């Protein structure tokens, strides 16, 4: 799916932007598959614009820095935007992402190696291991599926294409259906 989306975005860049990736964060966000994080990362790293790039690592760093148990996306973007400097914003965003990936890790944060530990409210409160509060796990659905393997006399197999907008969108599979509880396939 990412490859399809990337291809669609490349087509839009070619057709609407003369083959040049737009530098405006809002124009970037209008590209297929480009959300706030990707637009902020591209704008700051490639174009030097002071835009926040909040990924999971940055979320964790900011949650701990401000000792926030469950910050919302808008609050995190606001906090990140306040920190991003006008000079070298891409380097700053990359450093914050790297800090979250290597030092301020989800489990066993290495506060003794953190360059911003003296500013960290969660460390001061002893709550760094609890920040941000983990999201509850999603229940994984379990379905029984009846599948048919249809072989033609010439050895060809019957395959059907999955819907574009679902799980494994656009890929091919043997024909089948979810079987209701108690039914035989």
Positions of PLM-derived features:
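Catalytic cores of DNA base-excision repair glycosylases
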Residues: 1-130, 183
């Amino acid at each position: 799916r990412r490859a399809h989306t990337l291809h669609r975005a490349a087509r839009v860049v070619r057709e609407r932007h003369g083959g040049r990736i737009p530098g405006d964060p809002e124009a970037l966000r209008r590209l297929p598959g480009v959300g706030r994080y990707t637009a902020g990362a591209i704008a700051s790293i490639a174009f030097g614009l002071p835009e926040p790039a909040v990924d999971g690592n940055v979320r964790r760093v900011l949650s701990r820095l401000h000792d926030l148990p469950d910050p919302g996306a808008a609050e995190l973007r606001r906090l990140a935007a306040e920190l991003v400097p006008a000079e070298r914003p891409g380097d700053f965003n990359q450093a914050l992402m790297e800090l979250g990936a290597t030092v301020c890790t989800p489990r066993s944060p290495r506060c003794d190696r953190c360059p911003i530990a003296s500013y960290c409210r969660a460390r001061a409160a002893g709550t760094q291991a609890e920040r941000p509060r983990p999201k509850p796990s999603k229940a994984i659905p379990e379905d029984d599926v009846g599948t048919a393997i249809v072989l033609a006399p010439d050895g060809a197999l019957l395959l059907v294409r999955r819907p574009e907008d679902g799980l494994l969108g656009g890929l091919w599979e043997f024909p089948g259906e979810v079987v209701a509880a108690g039914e035989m396939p």
